[in-house]
Curated annotation (Swiss-Prot):
The basal body constitutes a major portion of the flagellar organelle and consists of four rings (L,P,S, and M) mounted on a central rod. Keywords: Bacterial flagellum, Periplasm, Signal. InterPro entries: Flag_FlgI (IPR001782). NCBIfam families: PRK05303.1 (NF003676). GO terms for cellular component: bacterial-type flagellum basal body, distal rod, P ring; outer membrane-bounded periplasmic space. It is found in: Periplasm; Bacterial flagellum basal body. This is Flagellar P-ring protein. The keyword Signal applies. The keyword Ribonucleoprotein does not apply. It holds the Pfam family FlgI. Assembles around the rod to form the L-ring and probably protects the motor/basal body from shearing forces during rotation.
């Protein structure tokens, strides 16, 4: 009996060390409480000769003519305006939940023509619309561009992107979105990651604190919570629930590979079994040259002959089997993979092969 209790205590201690507590607010979000996208089309002025080439971007000239006509300025028909300080841009923003009229939000400005840079430009008043084509905000202000560049004599140097920028607090909300918060007696909590175990643990924690039947797990991502009626009562109720702590069990072992950049990211649950890996690097170099043969006598009537000469060089390095030891923690996994001496691009193929062979104990996700 004492031996059984001692073993049970050891098991509980091991589970406690593997799990850690996190707040429900860090694991879930409230369904319906989300951002909405806004978009608009406008003009940026004040550029130092780095704007659109209006002959190649007729929409810039058309937009400028429409704006001037609204300001009472008429441009004679057929006028060919060669402007270099104006650029047509797209403006995007995120409408935050529960935003009120008069609140300011950040906007992102991106060139849609052939402007060289938006640095130093000013965005003119641009209406921002939602998917329902209603105007919800107005954007205007000076653009902050994070990049820098210079060009002279056919040479140019550029750091970061010059055709996009940001305006902090650059848009003012003019229309409020209708909200259904507080209208019903239930609220759905959506888990950030689908997990049946986590959904049930959140349900049990809420039921222990608020009484049985207060929460129900609908699926691996949704927990439905019964709340009192009224906005203020629901705000207080959610504030208490979101600050509850839940023991988080270890996550699924996962390796994420970015096929475009070659980056490989893995969590600490990834483990390796013993295996042998051989990876050969094959490189092919093709060099083509043109040999010109001319006659020795300029007036002898001979012809110049051009003969191509192609040289192909094929090299293969590596290829020997490398032993990979069984690894039980992330540091050991990293050391074992680094011992292969493979580049990130090679590592992508190696990890796929190791998973197929059953040596990689993790889910492999390629983005």
């Amino acid at each position: 009996m004492y031996v059984f209790k001692a073993l049970a205590g050891i098991v509980l201690a091991l589970v406690a060390t593997l799990a850690h507590a996190e707040r429900i607010r860090d694991l879930t979000s409230v369904q319906g409480v989300r951002e909405n996208s806004l978009i608009g089309y406008g003009l940026v002025v004040g550029l130092d000769g780095t704007g659109d080439q209006t002959t190649q971007t007729p929409f810039t000239t058309q937009t400028l003519n429409n704006m001037l006509s609204q300001l009472g300025i008429t441009v004679p028909t057929g006028t060919n305006m060669q402007l270099k300080n104006v650029a047509a841009v797209m403006v995007t923003a995120s409408y935050p939940p529960f935003a009120r009229q008069g609140q300011t939000i950040d906007v992102v400005v991106s060139s849609m023509g052939n402007a060289k840079s938006l640095r130093g430009g000013t965005l003119l008043m641009t209406p921002l619309k939602g998917v329902d084509s209603q105007v919800y905000a107005l954007a205007q202000g000076n653009i902050l561009v994070g990049g820098a560049g210079a060009s002279a004599g056919g040479s140019s140097v550029q750091v970061n992107q010059l055709n996009g920028g940001r305006i902090t607090n650059g848009a003012i909300i003019e229309r409020e979105l209708p909200s259904q918060f507080g209208a019903g007696n239930t609220i759905n909590l959506q888990l950030n990651d689908e997990d049946f175990t986590m959904a049930q643990q959140i349900t049990d924690a809420i039921n222990r604190a608020r009484g049985y039947g207060s929460a129900t797990a609908l699926d691996a991502r949704t927990v439905q919570v019964r709340v009192p009626s009224g906005n203020s009562s629901q705000v207080r109720f959610l504030a208490d629930i979101q600050n509850m702590e839940v023991n988080v069990t270890p996550q699924d072992a996962k390796v994420v590979i970015n096929s475009r950049t070659g980056s490989v990211v893995m969590n600490r649950e990834v483990t390796l079994d013993s295996c042998a890996v051989a990876q050969g690097n094959l490189s092919v170099t093709v060099n083509r040259q043109l040999n010109v043969n001319q006659p020795n006598t300029p007036f002898g009537g001979g012809q110049t002959v051009v003969t191509p000469q192609t040289q192909i060089d094929l090299r293969q390095s590596g290829g020997s089997l490398q032993s990979v030891r069984s690894s039980a923690n992330l540091n050991s996994v990293v050391r074992a993979l680094n011992a292969l001496g493979a580049t990130p691009m090679d590592l992508m193929s190696i990890l796929q092969s190791m998973q197929s062979a059953g040596c990689l104990r993790a889910k492999l996700e390629i983005i």
